[in-house]
């Protein structure tokens, strides 16, 4: 097992990113997506040049094991210094610190961009994600009970925030 490397995603990573993500809409309530977004969606996310938009991957040797990205929390200009974040890992990357490494690098970039607040929306139950967000300093600010319907069951989301400035 080699050392994990975290850095900016490239267009050549997007097929691997899509393959990692594809598992989650099909099998889990970790995302409330029910279908895989098209490759063009991932490319648009990668191509965004808005301040505070980042797309990172974590690798072991040449294999992409996970990804993290940040984007607009809301489109209205007053929200410009608030970003929403997401992290997804391949199953074989779990338990290796890959998620925390990705998130830590993403938060460093957001601090450098002078982002004020980071928001994470975590579908429940998700004890692993909850623990990672707590360890990174996020605080829980509320829960939207039964806000989504997936696999015939209602899913709640917990909202977390981290103040960077």
Question: At which residue positions do the language-model features occur?
Answer:
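Conserved beta-strand-loop-alpha-helix junction that forms the acyl-donor binding cleft
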Residues: 94, 120-130
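Conserved GNAT acetyl-CoA-binding A-motif
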Residues: 110-122
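A short beta-loop-alpha structural element at the N-terminal edge
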Residues: 4-19
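Conserved catalytic-core motifs of GNAT/GCN5-like acyltransferases
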Residues: 69, 77, 119-122, 134, ...
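Helix-loop element at the rim of GNAT/NAT acetyltransferase active sites that forms part
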Residues: 19-36
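Conserved acetyl-CoA-binding loop-helix of GNAT-fold acetyltransferases
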Residues: 95-109, 130-135
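Acetyl-CoA-dependent GNAT
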Residues: 34-92, 103-104, 109, 163-164
């Amino acid at each position: 097992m080699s050392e994990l490397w975290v850095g900016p995603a490239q267009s050549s990573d997007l097929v691997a990113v899509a393959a990692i993500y594809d598992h989650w809409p099909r099998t889990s309530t970790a995302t409330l997506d029910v279908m895989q977004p098209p490759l063009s969606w991932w490319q648009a996310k990668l191509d965004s040049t808005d301040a505070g938009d980042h797309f990172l991957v974590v690798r072991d040797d040449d294999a992409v094991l996970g990804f993290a990205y940040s984007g607009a929390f809301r489109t209205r200009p007053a929200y410009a210094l608030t970003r929403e974040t997401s992290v997804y890992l391949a199953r074989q990357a779990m338990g290796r610190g890959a998620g925390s490494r990705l998130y830590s690098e993403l938060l460093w970039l957001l601090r450098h961009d002078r982002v004020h607040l980071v928001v994470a929306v975590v579908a429940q139950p998700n004890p692993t994600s909850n623990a990672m967000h707590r360890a990174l300093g996020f605080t829980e600010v509320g829960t939207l009970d039964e806000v989504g319907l997936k696999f015939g069951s209602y899913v709640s989301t917990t909202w977390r925030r981290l103040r960077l400035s």
